[in-house]
Amino acid sequence: MVPGSGAIPVYGAGTVRPSAEIDIAPQVGGRVVWVDPGFRSGERVVAGQMLFRIEEADYRTRVREAEAALADRKVALLQAQEDAEIARAEYERYSSRHDPAGVASALTLREPQLKAAQAALLREEARLAEANLALSRTRIEAPFDGFVREESVALGQLAVPGEPVGRLFAADAAEVVVPLSDADAALIPGLWTTEGGEVSARAIADYGGIRYAWPGYVDRAEVSLDERTRTIDVIVRVPDPFAAGEPLQTTGGPLGDPPLLVGKFAEVAIEGLAPSDYFQVRRAALQPGNEIWAVGRDGVVRIVPVRVLQRGDDEVFVTGAFERGQAAIIGGLQFATDGMAVRTGGSATQ
C-alpha cells in the first residue's frame, strides 16, 4: 500500500479518428484531363495541391463572352453619360429662355437611361466574375494538409458537380473518443470549464507486439450522455499523430516506429485530479463491496471500507481510513474478519 501523490490517471479507450474529414467533389462539370499521380489512397497531400483538373475550353469561352459583353456595356454607359450631359445642356438653354423657374423631369435629363446603363454594366461585371470563378473551379485542390482515404477519378472521366470522387482526412491532428463513466469524468480537472490549462493525456496503441505512446490533451467533452451506454464521450486530441510514436519498451520489435493509425483502437491515459489523501494499492487487494483487508504490524486484520477513485490494470486508487504501517492483503486468505490475527509474508501483503 503506497500513499498516493500527484495526479490520478484516468484510463479509457477508443477508436482513433481524424480531426477533420471531407469529400472531394467538383463544383463544375466536365471531362477530367489531368490527375495528380499523388492523388491515390494512402498518399499525403498538402494544402493547395491540385488533385485533378477538368477541361477548361468551355469555361474559357464563357469568360471571353462575358468580357465582350462587359466591353459593350462600358461603351453603352459612356454613350448614356454623354446623352445625359447633352440633355441637361439642352434643357438649361431652353429653360433660360422660356421657363427659368421650371424643373426638368428625370426622363427629360435621361437619368433613368443612365441608371439602366450603369446597372447593365454591374450585371456584366458580375457575370464575368462568375465565369472566372467557374474557370478557377476546374482545378480541384486539397483544402488542407492531409491523407487520401479513397479516390475514384480517372483520366477522361466525366465529372459531375457535387458528386464525390475522393475523400481526404486532416494530417494535423487526430482524435480519440473515450467513453467514460461520470465517476471517471469527474476526475478530469476543468472538463466543463474553459479555465486553466490543457489537461495532458497519452494515446497508447500496440503495433507488432510493441506498445507506443503519443502525447495529447483533453480537447472537449460531449454535453449529453450516450443513450445506450450512459457514458460521457471525452475527446482527446493528439497533435501530429503521424509522427513516430514513443516505444514504451526497449525489447525487439518491428523496424521503424509507426504513426498513430486512423481507425486503430487505442488506450488513453488522462492526467486527472490530484487529491491530497489517497492510496495506491494492488488491484488484487480490493475485495467485493469495495473493502480492503489491511493488517498492521501487530498482525491484526482491519477491514477498511474504501472509495475507489480509479481502477487501473494492476492497481486501484482509493481513499479510506488506513493507519500508519498497515499493509494490504493481496492473497493467502479466503475470508477475513475484523480483528482476526494473521501471519503475513512478503508475497501476501503489499
Language-model regions: role of each:
Residues 7-69, 143, 147-155, 161-163, ...:
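Long, amphipathic coiled-coil "stalk"/hairpin helices in large membrane-associated assemblies
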Residues 43, 49, 125, 157, ...:
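Structural motif
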Residues 248-303, 307-350:
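Edge-of-domain interaction segments
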Residues 15, 44-47, 134, 141-187, ...:
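Surface-exposed patches in structured soluble domains
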Residues 208-276, 286:
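Structural microfeature recognizing short secondary-structure transition sites
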Residues 8-11, 68, 72-76, 80-82, ...:
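Extended amphipathic alpha-helical segments
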Residues 9, 173, 180-233, 287-291:
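Beta-strand/loop subdomains of soluble extracytoplasmic proteins
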Residues 8-36, 126-143, 168-170, 176, ...:
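Short beta-strand-turn/beta-hairpin segments enriched in glycine/proline and small hydrophobics
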